[in-house]
């Protein structure tokens, strides 16, 4: 059985179910949200210890309760949690999810499907994107501003929830309800391409089909709670607060042009894991060595030295000398 056929067969497992806003997002509300019964293999895994930013959660509630929600275009800096937020929504709703990844060399056929020779016959075999469209799975266009613009144009009818006619005459009708969302570092208009160099510019006809959101890094109290949920009993609260304060300072340095990139939530979690591992080491300064593994070794030594001064300020632990950098 082909992967496409297998994806079709799993649709029989889908049974509608209803969840409350409180069950999905954690704040008091019995407003119902449409989802499915547990058990489908394409439901994403929830992130352990995930904490919702209240503003983003309320935006999701508005989107999820629309009769026919438009596709989302969620723009924001790298590692701020765009894809993670979507995956946690669909995990809580037990909604099977297909994540579509592409790059500038990707062609429409690569994601929509291809004509193939089967048993001596030429047939069109739809890709998982069309299967998701037909069955009512959630669709995430990951890092969509890296797509070839022609790919997005080929998806116009899907973004409109229109009937799609395949090359062999097969008609694919959209499910009665589909959640489609795209994540991106830019708005698709070229702004920010100096930082995110592999991104593309899309025409207004494509961009007009999306509801636009902006995400940034979570507020300090949310990041602190994320660390607390992940490292409780392993790291002191004062250490986690200082880590978040350092991340905020690094992002400010980035905005001021003093750091080539911002530190992400992923980087913070990596720093915490590496700090726990290195805690008892005597051959390195654990606080700084774990930070460098998470983020610091990815920047110029002189920039790293500047970042170390931020850590020193927030933790009160003297920074080690970096070879080749004059104090």
List each language-model region with its residue ranges.
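C-terminal engagement/docking regions of AAA+ P-loop ATPases
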Residues: 47, 281-327
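Short coil/turn residues that cap or connect secondary-structure elements
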Residues: 136, 143, 235, 279, ...
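AAA+ P-loop NTPase catalytic core and its hallmark functional loops
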Residues: 2-238, 245
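Short alpha-helical interface patches
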Residues: 110, 208, 268-276, 312-314
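Conserved AAA+ ATPase small/helical "lid" subdomain
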Residues: 219-293
């Amino acid at each position: 059985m082909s992967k496409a056929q297998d994806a079709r067969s799993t649709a029989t497992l889908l049974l509608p179910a209803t969840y409350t806003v409180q069950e999905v997002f954690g704040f008091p509300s019995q407003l119902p949200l449409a989802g499915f019964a547990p058990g489908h293999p394409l439901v994403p895994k929830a992130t352990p210890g995930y904490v919702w930013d209240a503003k983003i959660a309320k935006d999701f509630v508005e989107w999820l309760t629309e009769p026919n929600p438009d596709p989302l275009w969620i723009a924001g800096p790298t590692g701020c949690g765009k894809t993670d937020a979507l995956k946690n929504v669909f995990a809580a709703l037990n909604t099977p999810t297909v994540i579509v990844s592409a790059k500038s060399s990707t062609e429409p056929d690569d994601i929509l499907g291809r004509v193939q020779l089967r048993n001596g016959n030429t047939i069109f075999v739809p890709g998982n994107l069309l299967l998701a469209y037909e069955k009512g799975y959630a669709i995430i266009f990951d890092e969509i501003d890296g797509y070839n613009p022609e790919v997005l144009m080929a998806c116009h009818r899907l973004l409109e929830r229109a009937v799609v006619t395949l090359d062999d005459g097969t008609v694919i009708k959209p499910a009665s309800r589909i959640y489609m969302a795209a994540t991106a570092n830019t708005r698709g208009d070229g702004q920010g391409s100096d930082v995110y160099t592999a991104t593309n510019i899309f025409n207004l006809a494509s961009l007009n089909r999306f509801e636009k959101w902006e995400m940034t890094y979570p507020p300090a109290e949310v990041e602190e709670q994320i660390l607390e949920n992940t490292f409780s009993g392993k790291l002191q609260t004062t250490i986690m607060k200082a880590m978040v304060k350092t991340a905020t300072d690094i992002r400010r340095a980035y905005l001021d042009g003093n750091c080539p990139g911002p530190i992400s939530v992923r980087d913070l979690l990596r720093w915490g894991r590496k700090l726990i591992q290195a805690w008892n080491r005597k051959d390195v300064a654990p606080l700084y060595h774990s930070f460098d593994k998470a983020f610091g070794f990815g920047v110029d030594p002189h920039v790293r030295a500047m970042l170390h001064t931020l850590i020193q300020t927030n933790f009160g632990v003297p920074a080690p000398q970096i070879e080749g950098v004059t104090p």
